[in-house]
C-alpha cells in the first residue's frame, strides 16, 4: 500500500505556546486513520497545518510525493486534499445544491457551472441529501448540515479527506448513519484522516489511530492497541467520560478474545 501523506517532525508555535512538537506519522492510500486526544491536544491545529491554514515552524509535509509545506488551501484542493470543519458554517442564503457547487469549484477554476451542478447532484445523492437540493442551507438541521459539510468537501473530488468531528452533536442513529457514509467514502478510494471524540465510533471505523496530548504524539496503533494503552488512558483521565469509554473498549476486547 503506497504512502499518500507523510508528516515529518511538524512543530507549530503561537508566540510562547508550543501547540505541536515534532509530530510525525504516515497515512497510506485507502486507509482510515483516526486522530484522538484530549481537548486542547493540538488536533485541529495539526489539521490546519496539514491543509495550509497555518505554516509549520519546523518540519515537512509530503502529499502525493510532493513537498506541500506552507502551500495554501486552494493549492492543496487542486492537488486533491479537502476537509470539513468542526463548526459547520454553510452559506445559509444559498441552496444546498449551490453550497456543494461552491465546493466543486474551490481549487478547480476550470470547472463550468454545468459540471459543478452535475457533481453537486451526484454528491448530494451519495450523502442522502438529494431531496434537499433546492432548500436553503440555513433551513437544515444539525445532522443535515454535517452531511452538507461533507458533501462540499467530497465535491472537490479529493484523494485525501480530513474530517474534523463530523459526529459531534449527533444522536446514536445519526452517528451510525454517518459512520456508514464514511465507510462508503473509503470504498470510493478516498483516504481519510479524522478527528473524533465519539470513541466507540472511531474505534470501529479506523484502521489505525494516533493520539496527541499537549501537542505531542504519544501513541499509534490499531484500535485494540490504543484501547489497551495505559498512557492514552492516563491522558484522558482529565475527561472521565472519555477515559471510561476507553476502558470499556479495553474490557470489550478482552472479553471477545482480541489482543
Please report, for each region that a protein language model flagged, where it lies by residue.
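Glycine-rich phosphate-binding loops of nucleotide-dependent enzymes
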Residues: 2-259
Amino acid at each position: 500500500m503506497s504512502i499518500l501523506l507523510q508528516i515529518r517532525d511538524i512543530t507549530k508555535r503561537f508566540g510562547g505556546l508550543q501547540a505541536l512538537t515534532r509530530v510525525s506519522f504516515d497515512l497510506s492510500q485507502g486507509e482510515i486513520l483516526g486522530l484522538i486526544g484530549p481537548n486542547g491536544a493540538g488536533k485541529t491545529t495539526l489539521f490546519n497545518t496539514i491543509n495550509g491554514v497555518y505554516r509549520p515552524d519546523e518540519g515537512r509535509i509530503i502529499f502525493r510525493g510532493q513537498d506541500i509545506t506552507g502551500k495554501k488551501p486552494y493549492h492543496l484542493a487542486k492537488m486533491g486534499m479537502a476537509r470539513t470543519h468542526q463548526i459547520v458554517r454553510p452559506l445559509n442564503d444559498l441552496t444546498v445544491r449551490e453550497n456543494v457547487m461552491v465546493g466543486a469549484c474551490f481549487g478547480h477554476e476550470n470547472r463550468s457551472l454545468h459540471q459543478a451542478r452535475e457533481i453537486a447532484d451526484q454528491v448530494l445523492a451519495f450523502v442522502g441529501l438529494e431531496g434537499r437540493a433546492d432548500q436553503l442551507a440555513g433551513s437544515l438541521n444539525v445532522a443535515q448540515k454535517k452531511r452538507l459539510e461533507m458533501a462540499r468537501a467530497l465535491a472537490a473530488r479529493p484523494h485525501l479527506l480530513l474530517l474534523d468531528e463530523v459526529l459531534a452533536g449527533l444522536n446514536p442513529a445519526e452517528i451510525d448513519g454517518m459512520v456508514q457514509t464514511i465507510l462508503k467514502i473509503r470504498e470510493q478510494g478516498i483516504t481519510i484522516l479524522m478527528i473524533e471524540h465519539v470513541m466507540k465510533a472511531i474505534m470501529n471505523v479506523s484502521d489505525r489511530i494516533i493520539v496527541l496530548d499537549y501537542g505531542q504524539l504519544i501513541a499509534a496503533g490499531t484500535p485494540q492497541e490504543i484501547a489497551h494503552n495505559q498512557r492514552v488512558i492516563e491522558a484522558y483521565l482529565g475527561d472521565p467520560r472519555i477515559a471510561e469509554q476507553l476502558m470499556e473498549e479495553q474490557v470489550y476486547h478482552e472479553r471477545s478474545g482480541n489482543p
